[in-house]
Amino acid sequence: ESDAKATSGGWFWHSGETIKSAERLFQMYLETVGRNATLILNCPPDQYGVLPAHTVTELAKLGKLLHNRLAWPVEGLNEPATDLAKVATIEVSDTRTGGKYEVGNLTDGDKETYWGTNDGDLDATITLTWNTPQVIRYLVMQEPIKLGQRIKDFMIEYSEDGATWTELCPDMQTTTVGYKRIIPLNGSTSNSYGNGYNARKLRITILDSRACPLLSNLNVY
């Protein structure tokens, strides 16, 4: 759980206080929700019990950023960001036998279904391929957390030509996934929506796990 202030004046309302910009709030979202935490964002009402207009404005802008970048459904807006994982061909190095653990579970939007490897297989690769290069900025992964946090180390690479690979965000710690991990592929939470990368392929290599790795959700934006 991450408790945070949206405003400058403290936990309660203070006259003349300002609110953090929508971009700063989005950064906070990436650094909390995107790192396997619950964000409790304090937005204090004024002395009349009303949220100040500047607070409402920035929160509405934050909603648009989440909608346009991470496909949060916001009523009244146009179509959200396209989940590029849903239009990719996905190949995996190993699929668990004896059950319904197929790769399609990664993109079905159901937290109760998941892809996994066989017992004893603690590493794996997941490769997404597109017919034409796609501009990618974020990777979202979720483990079926009721079965434990398993993944200990992973690496992300992309290929623009489909043959040569370049590691993404090499300086970012990629040691856990947990309930939800949102990774800005340029490695920056403060400027995550930069130019993006033209990718024909995206590869996630799980290097080590506490037990056979499992993933319930995989999204690319």
Segments (PLM) and residue ranges:
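Carbohydrate-binding surfaces of carbohydrate-active enzymes
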Residues: 2-95
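Generic recognition of flexible, low-complexity loop/linker segments
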Residues: 27-29, 126-128, 142-143, 203
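Short, solvent-exposed loop/edge-beta patches enriched in aromatic
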Residues: 33-35, 132-135
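Short strand-loop junctions, especially beta-strand C-caps/beta-turns
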Residues: 44-46, 142-144, 207
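Disordered, acidic Ser/Thr/Pro-rich linker "stalks" and the adjacent N-terminal cap
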Residues: 62, 66-133, 144-150, 170-177, ...
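Trp- and acidic/polar-enriched beta-sheet ligand-binding modules for extracellular glycan
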Residues: 119-123, 134, 145-221
